[in-house]
Regions:
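Loop/turn-to-beta-strand initiation segments
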Residues: 5-8
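NTP-dependent small-molecule kinase module
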Residues: 57-129
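Walker B catalytic acidic pair
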Residues: 13
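Hydrophobic/aromatic beta-strand patches that form the interior of the parallel beta-sheet core
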Residues: 10, 48-50, 100-102
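A glycine- and Lys/Arg-enriched "phosphate-lid" helix/loop adjacent to the NTP-binding pocket
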Residues: 18-86
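Conserved beta-strand edge residues that scaffold enzyme active sites
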Residues: 16-17, 106
Length: 129
């Protein structure tokens, strides 16, 4: 409804996450994943997908250092996380007009500034942190 009304919708996971987690990470059939995408979404494609990229070791350290228990994906081995990261990078490489890779191996203020800069550049909208 919000998209039909012309509103912006921001979500932290979408179809690329399914491709990366289930396809690249777990090895499920990409053809099956794409078929499900077509059934669920048809020809809908986001205007912008921001991929926050960090080395796997950095991501694992952040998971370990934060409060709360890791979820089932976060508990998976480093090989899974390497495949997952590569999946997101491959997706971005195949759709550079839609996907932007943000180097997230920095403090939160720097990463936030990079995201806002990307949105400004790609969508022509000026955001303030």
């Amino acid at each position: 409804p919000a998209l039909r009304a012309g509103d912006w919708v921001i979500c932290d996971r979408f179809a690329d996450s399914t491709r990366a987690y289930q396809g690249y990470g777990l090895g499920l059939s990409m053809d099956a994943i794409e078929t499900l995408y077509q059934i669920a979404l048809g020809d809908f494609v986001p205007d912008l997908t921001i991929i926050l990229d960090v080395p796997v070791e950095t991501g694992m350290k952040r998971i370990h250092d934060r409060d709360g228990d890791p979820d089932r994906y976060e508990r998976m081995d480093i090989g899974f996380h390497e495949r997952l990261r590569q999946g997101f990078l491959d997706i971005a490489g195949h759709e550079p007009g839609r996907c932007a890779i943000i180097d997230a191996d920095a403090d939160i203020d720097t990463v936030t500034a990079r995201i806002f800069g990307c949105v400004t550049q790609r969508l022509g909208v000026s955001l303030q942190p």
